[in-house]
Amino acid sequence: MIDIISQLGGVAWTIVAFVVALSIIVGVHEYGHYIVGRWSGIRAEVFSLGFGPRLWSRRDRRGTLWQVAAIPLGGYVRFLGDADAASAGPGRPVDPALRRQTLEGAPLWGRFATVAAGPLANFILSTVIFAAVIAIQGVAVDRVQVGKVAPTPPGIVNELRAGDEILSIDGRPVPDWPALFSAGRDLPAAAAFDWTVRRDGAEVTVRGPHPAPPLIAGVAPRSAASGAGLRPGDVIRAIDGTPVFRFDELRQRVEAADGGAILLRVWRPGEGEADYTLVPKRQDLPTADGYEKRWLIGVTGDSGYFTPATRAPGPFEALRTGIAQTSSIIVGSVSGLWAMLSGQIGSCNLGGAISIAESTGQAATTGFTSFVLWIGVLSAAIGFLNILPVPVLDGGHLAFFTWEAVTGRPPSPRALRILTSIGLAAVLSLMIFGLSNDILCR
């Protein structure tokens, strides 16, 4: 009974987190349509978060009705004489004197800007989130300096202290962070090494653990690790009874298992040790040359039992980082879509609403920062999806507007109806396919 209650609580938490994230992302997207439409002289009749019966509303001085509806699975802006910012073709009849205030009657540049503003708002949201997080958390200082020491399992010697500047590990110079990561890849598996550090102005040698320990930094949703209950901060002490001291040992043992079950002994801060049985999954993993299939349990490693000392970045540095991270998500979405269409990766990589909701719930469970960062990731992905040139999506209507700019006339009403029907069928098919993957590709 306790397990059932716990599972129901987890489902409820996932739903709440998903609704909150979706409302923020859709709200920003639709506000992009609204504000640019307003600047373009297009009158918005309704701005709605959610669909269905109205729960709350107010009308502003411009005549726009702002409302929250009962079904929190999206939202829309309804412009004068039209259905929403992404609609196509003739809208509802309006007074000819007001035609300029409709989406259909606005100049081409106004229509293009209004529709493009939705995805652009998503990209801006992602950039702001990533920039804000990096501004608050800080960036690692250039020298390899310990910020905060993490808890270590019993029997693991860690004499490092906050403020230590790492100079070498086992005789290997560590002048910068890439050198530390290189040491983590190259040093053999061992319980402890000599770390030379600068402490209080003097060089001292202390004992410390492997620089790339089997410490879990992240757990992928819908993975073997997630299903077993592993969490960030867990430390893998042994695999099938054999002690491990470096993260790469886990990867090697998972590959060697060839899909067979593995037994992990895991230490969790504040709870002690426990055993977990996991069955790795065969998944597509991006590489420098494309993709390759590997057996994975769905965990990423951390860079040691400490966090780096940080400094506050300048506003432009934080903004550049935010833009770079948003661009990386867009590029990754493009390459992933192409890899799926070209058959480089399996169709199970396309998830639907269930997998997105589960990922959102897991991010919220991990912590507020993880949840906010996930909203940034999801916002960029949704922005990219919306600019695809598929009728009923924003990108489809941008394609129609481009056709109009080139030819001097819009597509015929018949062509719009046919293309919109095809686009709607494609989007619905994709949603159903993603949902079926959520169920069948677990």
Q: Could you describe each region identified by the protein language model?
A:
Residues 27-28, 39, 75, 79-87, ...:
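Internal alpha-helical transmembrane segments
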Residues 153-165, 184-188, 224-235, 252-258, ...:
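A short glycine-leucine-enriched loop at secondary-structure breakpoints
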Residues 156-177, 227-247, 326, 419:
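Conserved PDZ fold ligand-binding element
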